[in-house]
Amino acid sequence: MITPPPLVILGFGYTGRWLYRLAHEQSGRILASSRQPERHLTEVPPTDRIRFDVTDPTSWPTLPREADLIWTFPAIPLDQVQEFAKQHCHAHRRLVVLGSTSAYDRHEQPTMDLPPWIDETSPINADLPRVQGEEYLRAHHGAIILRVAGIYGPHRNPVDWIRRGRVGPTNKFVNLIHVEDLARLCLQALRQGQAGTSYNISDGQPRRWVEICHEVSARWGVVSPRQTLAEEAGKRIRNHKALTQLQYTLRHPDFYQALRSIEGLPA
């Protein structure tokens, strides 16, 4: 059996921590990076910690040359992203970059009650700095771009968002993905994704906040104190390409079952 190359997780936030844990299910060395590893990587063995800051070229050589990369933070600023990639994103290195479905935000879009479905052929907003960095990495260095919907999971619970009034019963569509599914899709993209392509990462079930608020209220009696305000229509993200090409079955396809599990709420 061929041992896979080392994997470096660039960034150790919410998604990075899940990635680090799940990546240990595969063989091979897993390393994690942070701008302040002694502060943010305490759960990682010291031998697997890397100081990396895309804005600090002196930190770039710390990455093992043979390692693949999963890049979890915004690919900005563009000039530093370009310089790093020219020096360190060689042809044999697999690179997965986490983007956002906000790449599809376009100010000139008319407001409509039922927005059209968005897939990977839909236009993106190249004026966004993050999108510029992602597209440079995709077009020039074969990066696999994952355009990620809203992330939820343990300690990032939409029921709490409603309870605290962060969201209310608006007609805006929201697209979500459980953090475990996101992390597993990152690893699957690293193994099977096509270099230089992009994938939309969501559960494929866009919902209006008013529908979510109604269901959460009916099931668990949680009501948002936020007043309903006129908002944009939101987006409806299609995930077919990711699930089929990456050959992945969602672990959390039932949103409300996932919410119940996250907080131990009654069914």
Predicted stretch roles:
Residues 230-267:
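C-terminal amphipathic/interface module of NAD(P)-dependent oxidoreductases
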Residues 128-131, 140, 151-164, 180, ...:
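Glycine/proline-rich active-site loop of Rossmann-fold NAD(P)-dependent oxidoreductases
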Residues 85-125:
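Conserved Rossmann-fold NAD(P)-dependent oxidoreductase catalytic core, especially the SDR/UDP-sugar
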Residues 183-188, 192-239:
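Mid/C-terminal beta-alpha module of Rossmann-like enzyme folds, strongest
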Residues 121-145:
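Active-site Tyr-X1-5-Lys
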Residues 16-17:
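N-terminal Rossmann-fold NAD(P) dinucleotide-binding loop
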Residues 145, 167-190:
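Substrate-positioning beta->alpha
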Residues 46-87:
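NAD(P)H-binding glycine-rich loop region in Rossmannoid oxidoreductase-like domains
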